[in-house]
Amino acid sequence: PLGDVHGRVVGQLRSVHARGVEGCRTMYGARGFVCHHNTDIWGDCAPQDRVVPATLWPMGGAWLCLHIIEHYRYSQDEDFIEGYFDILRDAVLFFMDTMVKDAQGYWITGPSVSPENTYRTENGETGSLCMGPTMDAQILRQLFAGYLMICKDLSANDELARQVHEHLEH
């Protein structure tokens, strides 16, 4: 069943988290954990390969954490979520430390990429790195909303939850 496979993906987050905490600190000087576009059975989280339209994507950890949120959303298993809350919280912390406000006052990620996508500038040059790709915003909206839902259920509302709420509002 799909649930069995899902459990293995969520279980893999333990090794990804351990390596991603170190990568977050050394690469970004930030709290939390980060996983880029690729990982493996050893939990490697650093950017890999030479394909710029995918390599630098820092959303892998957040995307994987959506599995934690979905599992909890449909199971309401508090033992499960208490066992993974540290990973979810660390994924959120990374973005609290690294997001910046754009000219319109919105919180955005960057530099990032929209995996395997390139854009063309007005003068015809192509690029991949950008600020605030839509895919990042969609993943973070789900991550942040899920985090707040779980904080409410666990009565774990704190300063981080307040910051997350502010980021969702702006």
Regions found by a protein language model. Name each.
Residues E82-D86:
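Aromatic- and glycine-enriched glycan-recognition loops and surfaces
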Residues R31-I81, M96-H165:
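The feature captures the catalytic groove of carbohydrate-active enzymes
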Residues Q12-S15, R19, I87-K101, G146:
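Alpha-helical scaffold segments in carbohydrate-active enzymes
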